[in-house]
């Protein structure tokens, strides 16, 4: 059930060889809600799509939220929900990023996009 923290140094080094990484966010205590806004520049907002549920380890996080009586929104405020690292890139680098992550056998999912918005730094869409 529990695994040691994933160390992403080798993955990030591989990515940075050919991809312009804009921001990197390690999701730790405080979950996505507290950590991601810290790396979003002023005037920008990260739009995250959780409408399909948890992107990784869905059964595990469904069990935790059920037993703890927490909504998925509350879960994203406390846990990483299976998302250990968020890498923000330019959209033009998407295909290259996917290729590199597959090459190093790093599971990934596209969570959303960064848009212009001066009113907030994070918006999460829930199902």
Language-model segments: residues:
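Glycine-/charge-enriched secondary-structure boundary and capping motifs
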Residues: 1-127
């Amino acid at each position: 059930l529990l695994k040691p923290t994933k160390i992403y140094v080798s993955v990030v080094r591989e990515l940075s060889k050919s991809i312009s990484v804009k921001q990197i966010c390690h999701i730790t205590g405080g979950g996505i809600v507290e950590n991601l806004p810290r790396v979003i520049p002023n005037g920008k907002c990260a739009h995250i799509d959780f409408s399909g549920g948890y992107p990784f380890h869905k059964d595990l996080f469904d069990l935790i939220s059920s037993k703890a009586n927490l909504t998925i929104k509350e879960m994203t405020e406390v846990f990483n929900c299976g998302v250990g690292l968020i890498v923000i890139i330019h959209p033009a680098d998407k295909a290259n990023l996917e290729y590199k992550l597959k090459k190093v056998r790093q599971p990934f999912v596209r969570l959303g996009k960064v848009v212009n918005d001066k009113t907030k730094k994070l918006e999460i869409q829930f199902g």
